[in-house]
């Protein structure tokens, strides 16, 4: 009997380790696909297709995932706009509207009302959400020119400015 308990414990431990290993490798792969992440094609508020790598040029991209109906996003948005101005020579800020609930017309109204001038894209099919493992909004992700994630934070501005100025 004692031997069976030990075997069950070993099997349970093996299962836990295997689960953690598989989950970790999935999350790592999702966030380190190199150039593939930059090859995503989304649409802008006018319906024009835009590839992320075309926007970046030789600068990193600061991707801001948000939605008009998201209250925390409304609080964060002015801070992101300030970062876009302050670090315009270091990074290109791109807003990515997610969730599929906002129409392009609603997004344009929101941008105009809030005087948002940085590039805005729409992720209708959650391609970017999946590629960048976005689980909640608002979130900011800093990606270098090759698609490597440099910064990924669900509490968007806590450490980002320190990271950008360093």
Q: Where does each model-flagged region fall?
A:
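Thiol/disulfide oxidoreductase modules built on the thioredoxin-like
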Residues: 112-116, 124-164
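Bacterial N-terminal signal peptides that target proteins for export
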Residues: 4-14
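Conserved redox-active cysteine motifs that mediate thiol-disulfide chemistry
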Residues: 65-82
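N-terminal "domain-start" segment that seeds a small globular fold
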Residues: 27-53
